[in-house]
């Protein structure tokens, strides 16, 4: 998946979560 925009939350995609976490783009719940 692609990186999420600033302020957006992941929709359950682990790729988006990983990208989100690594790039500090948003407050993603890591599971």
Curated annotation (Swiss-Prot):
Keywords: Secreted. The keyword Secreted applies. Expressed by the venom gland. The keyword Secreted applies. GO terms for molecular function: toxin activity. One of its GO terms (cellular component) is extracellular region. It is found in: Secreted. InterPro entries: Toxin_34. Disulfide bonds: none annotated. Not toxic to mice by intracerebroventricular injection. Belongs to the neurotoxin 04 (omega-agtx) family. 03 (type II/III omega-agtx) subfamily. This is U14-ctenitoxin-Co1c. It comes from Ctenus ornatus (Brazilian spider).
């Amino acid at each position: 998946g692609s990186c999420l925009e600033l302020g957006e939350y992941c929709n359950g995609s682990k790729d988006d979560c990983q990208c989100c976490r690594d790039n500090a783009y948003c407050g993603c719940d890591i599971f």
